[in-house]
Curated annotation (Swiss-Prot):
Keywords assigned by UniProt, alphabetized: Early protein
Induction trigger: Expressed in the early phase of the viral replicative cycle.
Function: Plays a role in virus cell tropism, and may be required for efficient virus replication in macrophages.
Similarity annotation: Belongs to the asfivirus MGF 360 family.
Protein name: Protein MGF 360-15R
Length: 271
C-alpha cells in the first residue's frame, strides 16, 4: 500500500502528469522503473538498447527524446526517430545538465564527457568519472536496485556496488553483485571489517565461501574489529599471531592485546 501511495504521488514529475494512477500496477510489474526520474529511465533503457522498454515508457508519455541524449548508433537512433523523437539541440542538452535530478547520471552515460563546472575543470576526467560512478551506484542502491544491472559494466563498478551494499546492509544487491564480481570476497571483507558490520560479515562467510578465516582475521585486525576477530576464532580461525602483529602494525594496541588474550584461551582449550 505504501508503494502504491508513493507511485501515486510520483505520477507527477516536473509539474507534469506523466501517467494515470490506473497504470500504477502495470508499472510495478515493469521492474520498478518508475522509482527513478522518468527521463533517467528512458536514458538507461536506451543505453542498453532495450527497445521493448523504451517503447513501453514512450507509451506512458515519457519522451523518447531523452533516449537521443545517450545513443550514437544508427539503428537505435532510427528506432527513436520512428517513435517520433526530435533530436535535442545543444541548448536543450545544456538545459538538461542544469537539472540536478539526474545531470550526474547524464554525464556518466556520456562517458563523463559532459560540461564540467568551473570548480571541476582542473580535476582529471578519470577522477570526475570515478566520482560520478560512486554517486550513481550509491543512489541506485537506495532507490532502484533493479537498474544496477544496466549501469554496472566493469569490475570496478561492481566493486563500488558491493562496497555500498555491504556498508548499508542492502543484502539482495550484495548477493547480485557478488555473483558478478571476481574480487567480491576481498571487497566485502574490507568493507565489513572497516565498518565492523557483523551482518555483512555473516553473508561474506555464508554465501561467499570465505573459508579462509585466517585471512578474514588479519583484515579485521587492520580495522580494530575485535568482534569480528572473536567470530573468526569461533568459526575455526587460528591465525591470531598474525592478526596480533597486524593490529600492532596499524596502531591498534588494544586489539593486539585482545588477540594475545585469545591466543591464551585457545591454548588452554587444547590442553
Amino acid at each position: 500500500m505504501v508503494l502504491v501511495e508513493f507511485l501515486t504521488g510520483f505520477s507527477y514529475l516536473y509539474g507534469k502528469k506523466l501517467f494515470s494512477v490506473s497504470k500504477i500496477m502495470d508499472m510495478i510489474c515493469l521492474d520498478y522503473y518508475t522509482i527513478i526520474p522518468a527521463p533517467l529511465a528512458m536514458m538507461l533503457a536506451a543505453r542498453v538498447k532495450n527497445y521493448d522498454l523504451m517503447k513501453r515508457l514512450h507509451e506512458w508519455d515519457i519522451s523518447i527524446d531523452y533516449a537521443l541524449l545517450v545513443v550514437d548508433d544508427v539503428p537505435t537512433i532510427d528506432y527513436c526517430l520512428s517513435l517520433g523523437a526530435r533530436s535535442p539541440t545543444r541548448a536543450q542538452k545544456r538545459q538538461l545538465l542544469g537539472d540536478n535530478t539526474f545531470s550526474p547520471v547524464y554525464k556518466y552515460l556520456m562517458n563523463c564527457s559532459g560540461f564540467p563546472t568551473k570548480r571541476e575543470k582542473n580535476i582529471p576526467s578519470d577522477v570526475q568519472c570515478e566520482r560520478l560512478q560512486k554517486i550513481i551506484i550509491k543512489e541506485l542502491i537506495f532507490n532502484c536496485s533493479v537498474l544496477l544491472e544496466m549501469v554496472l559494466l566493469t569490475e570496478r563498478e561492481y566493486a563500488y556496488a558491493l562496497h555500498y551494499a555491504a556498508k548499508y546492509n542492502q543484502m539482495p544487491i550484495l548477493m547480485y553483485c557478488w555473483q558478478q564480481s571476481t574480487d567480491s570476497e576481498s571487497v566485502l571483507l574490507k568493507t565489513c571489517c572497516s565498518d565492523k558490520n557483523i551482518n555483512c560479515f555473516n553473508h561474506c562467510i555464508l554465501y561467499g565461501g570465505a573459508q579462509n578465516f585466517d585471512a578474514a582475521m588479519v583484515e579485521a585486525a587492520k580495522h580494530d574489529a575485535r568482534l569480528l576477530i572473536n567470530y573468526c576464532v569461533m568459526l575455526g580461525g587460528r591465525s591470531l599471531n598474525e592478526a596480533r602483529e597486524t593490529a600492532a602494525a596499524f596502531g591498534h594496541l588494544e586489539c593486539a592485546q585482545h588477540c594475545l588474550r585469545l591466543q591464551s584461551y585457545i591454548v588452554d582449550d587444547t590442553d
